[in-house]
Each structure stands twice: as C-alpha cells, then as structure tokens.
Amino acid sequence: MDVVDLWVNLVTSEGAREFLGQAQFANIPGYLGSSSTEGIATEGMLALMDELGVATGILCAGMDRTAEHALAVADEHPGRFLVALGLADSERPTRNVRRIRKLAEHTATSMVRVMPLNNQVAIDDARHYPVYSVCEELGIPVGINVGIPGPRVRSRVQHPELLEGVLIDFPDLVVIGAHMGHPYEELLMNYMRKWPNLYLSCTAYAPQYLDPGLVQFMNSKTYRGRVLWGSDEPWFPMRRSLTEARALPLDDDAMALFLGGTARRLLDRSAR
C-alpha cells in the first residue's frame, strides 16, 4: 500500500526547543502527549519512514531559504519527499506570489500551506487571495489549517466557515483542510459534500479520536478519499498516528485512499 505522510518536519534539537519555547506554543508537548524536544534529521526521518512503511513524506518548509534546502533534500532522496511551502508572512502578497512561481518550477513543490494561527491573518483575508489565485492557476493545492488549534492563540481566524468564500471565489483551487478542523467535523463534511475540491486531513490529530460520523463518511462509496492521513512528525509522532490510522474500521479501498492514494494523486506532480 502506498503510504504518504501529509506533514513531516525536519528540525534540529535546538530548533525544537526554540519552537516550543515560544509562549503560544508552550503547551504543545502536554497537548500532544509528546515532548518532541529532540527534533529529527533527514536520516532519522528516513529510517522511521522505512520502519513504518511510509513511502513519501510531505516536508514542511518556509517561503524563505528553507524552501531551497527542503527541495535539495527531496533531490537527494528521489521519491521520498515532496515539499510544502508554509506561508509565514501574509503582509507582502506580491512577493509571495513571485516566490511561489519560482519554487513551483521544481516538480517536488507539491502544495502551499496557509496557517492562520501563526500570523493571525484569517483564511479569507484579502492578503491571502493572490496566493490562492496563483495556486489555482498553477494547479498547486493549498493546505489551510482549520479548527481550534493547540497553541494558545485566537482560533476565529481559522474557523472553517471562512473557507466558503475561498471555495466560491476559486472554484478550481484544491483546498486541503489541515489539523482535522475539530470540533467542526460535521460542518466540514457538509462543505465537502458541496465542494468537490475540498479535502480534509488528520495531521496533528490522534486518529483514534476521529469523529465516528467522519469515519463513516470516509468509508462511504461517494466520499471515500476525501480525508488524508498525516502525522506532523515530530510534533505529533508518526508512529502513533499511523498505528491508530491503520486501526480505523475502513475497508481496504477506503484505507488505501486515506493513507496515501489521494495524497499521491493530488500532490505528486511528477505522477500527473
């Protein structure tokens, strides 16, 4: 079975401590039940992926020089990594568009991530619209964090209701809701029924706690393949996430789509 982890992070131990040392993220270790202070390097990530049977990881990078570093890692390990560009600065939309166009020349650039909790700029803010527009034009999916986040920040900026305007204004844009969207799963299922280009992922969320109605949705003949698996390693351990994901009561076809089939179709530009 082709397994694709939608969200992995390469981070040094120093970087992990610095990240978790920020006031808004200080509760993350307890919230996820993992210290995550040791970080993980490329070889450690590959060893973990090999052990667990994960073929490809979607590597989270910034729009700065970390993007080139991540793409170099993808080049060094063909087929093992694709790269997601995390939008950190929403204040300079034109620069972001130029960066996306440049980085999209590399086929390992698989998606752009909008994470409203980080900069407190809402999903439907006008500053994000140029990013959505260029991604729609280039056929690159956008991942958008939705729901109440673990960090102690205002969550209204990523309420799933804010997706509606984006989906209306960019009908050909593929949007993947990130980090589960809890406690708004029912709303997100209704949106997915309505919008064929909307997907959801369980990144940074324990699969054993998936809403039973969502699991039924994932198993249905009509909507299977609309929810994607991902861990957020090392912040949420890949081992725990994948073990719990494989234990869900999904039939073989639904499980294959959940664990990697849909991600491969949407994100692997070399396979199109």
Predicted regions and their residues:
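Mid-to-C-terminal alpha-helical segments outside catalytic/metal-binding sites
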Residues: 1-9, 13-56, 222-228, 237-272
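Active-site neighborhood of phospho(di)ester-bond hydrolases with catalytic His/Asp-centered motifs
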Residues: 3-6, 59-60, 84-85, 113, ...
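Short aromatic-enriched loop/helix-cap "lid" or pocket-rim segments at secondary-structure transitions
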Residues: 14-20, 70-71, 96-97, 154-156, ...
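Short, acidic/polar
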Residues: 38-48, 91-103, 185
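A structural motif corresponding to the C-terminal end of an alpha-helix
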Residues: 47-55, 77, 138, 169-173
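Active-site gating/metal-coordination segments in enzymes
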Residues: 55-56, 64-157, 194
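Ligand-binding grooves and catalytic loops that recognize ribose/phosphate and carbohydrate rings
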Residues: 90-134, 216-218, 222-229, 233-266
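Catalytic pocket-lining loop regions of alpha/beta-barrel enzymes
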Residues: 110-111, 124-228
